[in-house]
Amino acid sequence: YSSAASDVYKRQMTHIGQIIEKELHRQERSVTWFARRLYCDRTNVYNIFRRQSLDTELLLRISIILEYNFFQIYSDIYNNRT
């Protein structure tokens, strides 16, 4: 990475936890509903919302539960790099 490329990457990086939280609310789903499907407690869900990045396996599970391809966000960043 050059410094300029790194700066572009950082500006474009998303806070995946916030995006997941917004999608959950958009679907009008509760944190309890989400926690049950993730097989964790609500505290863990709130911890996910605070995370800027997530393990890919967890992100895949979340994508399946919410029927939303969160990986597309990263693909778009990759495809739009200069």
Locations of regions flagged by a protein language model:
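Recognition helix of helix-turn-helix/homeodomain-like DNA-binding domains
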Residues: Y39-L54
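Single conserved hydrophobic/aromatic residue that forms the stacking wall/gate
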Residues: Y1-Y9
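DNA major-groove recognition helix of helix-turn-helix/homeodomain DNA-binding modules
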Residues: E57-I73
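Short basic helix-loop element that most often maps to the first helix and adjoining turn
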Residues: G17-R37
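Residue-level detection of the helix-turn-helix DNA-binding "recognition helix"
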Residues: H25, R50-R51, I64, Y78
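Key DNA-contact positions within bacterial/archaeal DNA-binding proteins
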Residues: T32, T43, F71
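Residue-level signal for the short linker/turn that defines the boundary of a DNA-recognition helix
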Residues: S3, R29, L54-E57
